[in-house]
């Protein structure tokens, strides 16, 4: 990732963001949930859930609300993870 600086030119340490699908996969596995059943419970096809785990799909507001209802982890948290990841990717692309 490229360096990020404030207006005074001081380098800022940016945390490494990860795709929220990675965290979701860990959460599902820790709870002992079956992936196919979980996909149905949040209104996704199993293949789409798999793509989410791999970072090939994003968590949008609808999915975030479904995750909140199913897992008890706020929609804002899921969207925050997605936003942090998206910003990191955008910064990397700008600094290439």
Placement of each model-derived feature along the sequence:
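Short, compact, well-ordered microdomains
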Residues: 68-69, 77-80
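Short, basic-rich loop-to-helix N-cap that marks the start of a DNA-contacting helix
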Residues: 56-70
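Short, charged recognition helix plus adjacent turn
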Residues: 79-96
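A short, Lys/Arg-rich alpha-helix, primarily the initiator
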Residues: 6-34, 80
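Short alpha-helical DNA-recognition segment
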Residues: 33-51
